[in-house]
Amino acid sequence: MIPYAAGVIVPLALTFLVQKSKKEKKRGVVVDVGGEPGYAIRNHRFTEPVSSHWEHISTLPELFEISCNAHSDRVFLGTRKLISREIETSEDGKTFEKLHLGDYEWLTFGKTLEAVCDFASGLVQIGHKTEERVAIFADTREEWFISLQGCFRRNVTVVTIYSSLGEEALCHSLNETEVTTVICGSKELKKLMDISQQLETVKRVICMDDEFPSDVNSNWMATSFTDVQKLGRENPVDPNFPLSADVAVIMYTSGSTGLPKGVMMTHGNVLATVSAVMTIVPDLGKRDIYMAYLPLAHILELAAESVMATIGSAIGYGSPLTLTDTSNKIKKGTKGDVTALKPTIMTAVPAILDRVRDGVRKKVDAKGGLSKKLFDFAYARRLSAINGSWFGAWGLEKLLWDVLVFRKIRAVLGGQIRYLLSGGAPLSGDTQRFINICVGAPIGQGYGLTETCAGGTFSEFEDTSVGRVGAPLPCSFVKLVDWAEGGYLTSDKPMPRGEIVIGGSNITLGYFKNEEKTKEVYKVDEKGMRWFYTGDIGRFHPDGCLEIIDRKKDIVKLQHGEYVSLGKVEAALSISPYVENIMVHADSFYSYCVALVVASQHTVEGWASKQGIDFANFEELCTKEQAVKEVYASLVKAAKQSRLEKFEIPAKIKLLASPWTPESGLVTAALKLKRDVIRREFSEDLTKLYA
């Protein structure tokens, strides 16, 4: 009897001790700071914000050159060879471009430095002056990175612009910064040509593709990226390294409200974030391979690639449209980018991780029977273990489930992922756990903004908690200040709450030519530290980790005085398998909220087929009362799982068939909702929901 009792008591005791040690570990500690009174936390390992991880290095081009020389013969930048393009026509007459891609072809660190030096010299030879600005307007690719480093080497400020930006925002960005040279792909060059008469200062265009339209504006000097490099190789120019305080990048936000704002980042700002991130992922180094596919015009991707370049890791370039074996642009039988690259590290925005989760669940549900039961059982066993229970699947049993169930799922992302970095928006706890178990890798949730150069907080490698964004990065102090109007106070129990304010060497200079907005959200305290007021609401856990709980702008007061956090409700409802995207809308003149739901075509059509419901197309199905009721019931279930209040659950919904994409203008390039645009686009539907 004693062995059996021990078999129960020992695991329980170990579970208690492990969970207790996790709770007791201090990841952030309280710190006394200047400025507006509040509750401030710093990283537990650093008493002051870190500016540079390297002595005597204060700018990005210095760091890049040292890294390239140190890792000269190692592979660095990889691009897949394009074998062929094909046009396929679907049954409804729509055409789709499909790509047949080969293996990755690599540049070493040494060859990349040569390419950067050649481009920097070529930039001078075509007439670009140091005091003029360059804009990079293209999808993420190796030429983007080389262009950026080439400009840094000549102390030229780079204006970054999303390739999905609309005409009005594109004109605004280029004209406001008085850009004289634009570096772009052939696709983006066509966009520039359409608005050429509205561009006031552009003189030169460098096309990353050797083949580009011949009818370029006659007032522009148009040349290929290859020719600029050739010109620089034949006429080398000495570097003109910047100072730490010089502006490296003017990064235009993706503009979820109104025209995009240009955030001015110094070399010191970016270097501080790079230095801080270096301390987070253990054993980060030469053996790692990074999958680069998010927009380099987004600070999350730019910072991540800067870190990889510094530590000697390889970077393989891809695209969201060719990422996996089943991606939209991948020709059947061709490997997706992750399968070809087999990366060890990836960044992802929550929307992409949600799609991975939904895709796996759809396949499991479609198989049904024994396969589904096996998956559900294995998942439950691993979930118990990852939540700290010694009665979950550990050791040999974990290995068994990995081999039998999860190995094929891991292959979706190449099979070698050891760390995922999520940022740009809140990640649901459900998705985080699902990816943890099925991909077999921890997800580091980060919190930062363009204005903080991506710096803010980051969850540590061994922190398996969900719903939090970690402790302050070594480059930042994070402070909560009272927002009395919204009912969030630093004196709240059991955890202090308030608006999140970030300070440190990563805080940017402000908005380009927008002093009024800069003064509104940037403050300098009596100690000289710069702070940014984020507009997000958070709370600190006892271990010093931050949790995002609201956003000031997304909170609406209903007719009877209740407050609804739109973002919080959307995050809760998005776990429904029927939801592709969702926007909750609340009108203060009513006592309830409503929602626009972009339905998941695969899931809703699958349900309708099982129910024997006839429909001519998906658009018609979304108007059927049975479909609306089914989706609504799923939303209510998700709301109850997340313990939403009754007034937070949308009373009525409208099902939409067409997806919201950056091209549609309804979401940003980072897939964030453009609420004002969506409200205008669907104003009639919203009015009917309140009728």
From Swiss-Prot:
Q: In which tissues is it expressed?
A: Highly expressed in developing seeds and young rosette leaves.
Q: What happens when the gene is disrupted?
A: Reduced amount long-chain fatty acid (LCFA).
User: Where does the chain bind ATP?
Assistant: 250-261
Q: In which pathway does it act?
A: Lipid metabolism; fatty acid metabolism
Q: Supply the PROSITE patterns for this chain.
A: AMP_BINDING (PS00455)
What EC number(s) are associated with this protein in UniProt?
A: 6.2.1.3
Q: Which UniProt keywords apply?
A: ATP-binding, Chloroplast, Fatty acid metabolism, Ligase, Lipid metabolism, Magnesium, Nucleotide-binding, Plastid
Domain of life the protein comes from: Eukaryota
Is Nucleotide-binding one of the keywords UniProt gives this record? yes
Chief location of this protein?
plastid
> Which molecular function term from Gene Ontology is one that the record holds?
long-chain fatty acid-CoA ligase activity
Keyword Ligase among UniProt keywords? yes
Protein role? Activation of long-chain fatty acids for both synthesis of cellular lipids, and degradation via beta-oxidation. Preferentially uses palmitate, palmitoleate, oleate and linoleate.
Q: What is this protein called?
A: Long chain acyl-CoA synthetase 9, chloroplastic
